[in-house]
Amino acid sequence: MMHDSPKRVVRCVRLATEDDPALSSLESRCSVLPWTEQAFAEAFAGKTFHAFGIRETASPLSPRELAGYIAVYHTPDEVEILNIAVREDRRRHGYGRLLMATALQDAKETGILQGVLEVRISNAPAIHLYESFGFRQAGKRRGYYQDTGEDALIYTLDMGQTRTNP
C-alpha cells in the first residue's frame, strides 16, 4: 500500500537572535568547532552579522528547527562567508546552493561587490559549491584549523561578475 506524504516545502528565511538555539543545535551537529548559542547572540548584537536559514514545512523537523544555515559579515565593501552548514540528512538537495545564493544576493542588494571566505583544504564539496558561484582561490593559511592543523584555502569573489544563482 502506498501512502501519500505531504510535499516538503523549503523556505530560506532571514534569521534573528531568537533563532540562536536552533543555530547552535545545528552547529553542534555539523561542526567540529561549533559556535555556541552565546556566540550567535553576540554576533547578532552587531549590525554587520547576517544569517539565513532553511526551514521546511510538511517535514519531520519541528517548525523552529533548521535544515541548514549560512552566516556572514557585511563590511562596507565585502561580504565574508563565516559558516555554512546543512544537516547531514538534508545534504545533496541544493540547500547549500540556496543558502549561498540568498546570502550573496542580499549582500549585492546592499551594494557589496566583493566576497571572501576560508575553507578547509579537504572540504571538496564546499570548494565545488564556492567555485560554482565564481569564487577563486586567492591564497592559503597554513595550519589554520586548531583541531587538526589543516590548511585553509582563501577564496575571493568579484560579485560584479558573478552568478548569484548558478
Descriptions of predicted regions:
Residues 81, 115-119:
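Conserved hydrophobic beta-strand within the GNAT/NAT acetyltransferase core sheet
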Residues 87-101, 108-110, 120-128, 132-133, ...:
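Conserved glycine-rich acetyl-CoA-binding loop
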Residues 93, 97, 142, 151-153, ...:
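Acyl-donor (CoA/ACP) binding surface of acyl/acetyltransferases
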Residues 118, 136-153:
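Conserved catalytic-core motifs of GNAT/GCN5-like acyltransferases
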Residues 3-7, 11-89, 100-106, 110, ...:
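Acetyl-CoA-dependent GNAT
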Residues 44-45, 96, 124, 147:
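Generic structural signal for helix capping and beta-alpha/helix-loop junctions
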